[in-house]
Amino acid sequence: MSKVAISQSNYIPWKGYIDMIASVDVFVLYDDMQYTKRDWRNRNKIKTPQGTKWLSIPVEVKGKYFQKINETKISDPNWIASHWSSIQQNYKKAPYYADVCHWLKPLFDQAKELPLLSNVNRLFLQEI
C-alpha cells in the first residue's frame, strides 16, 4: 500500500514539510483551493539579530476573496531583491551559507520570471 500526503504550498518550505514529503510514496500539492491571507502560502520567517522577520511575497488580493492559491498573482516583482538581501544580511556568517547560497540564489533569479505564487512555491519545493 502506498503512503500519500496532500498539502497546500508554502513559501520556502520548512524542515517538517520536507520530512513529510520524504516519508511518503506520493505527494500531492493541493493549490486548487482558496488562498488565505496572513498564512504561510506567501510568507515565512527568518531569524535576525533583532528577532524574527517576516518575508512576504506581495500578492493581489483586493476584491479577490474566493481566488484559489494557483490563481494568486504576484503584485510586485521587487520582493525578490528585498528577500535575498535580508537572507544575505542575516545568514552570511552562518555555517554552510556559502554552500547553500550557490543553489539558493538561482532559485530567486528564476522566481523573477514567475507571475503566480503557486509557481514560485512549487519551484522552491522542487529544488529544496
Q: Model-predicted segments: where are they?
A:
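Residues lining hydrophobic/aromatic ligand-binding pockets adjacent to catalytic sites
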Residues: 1-127
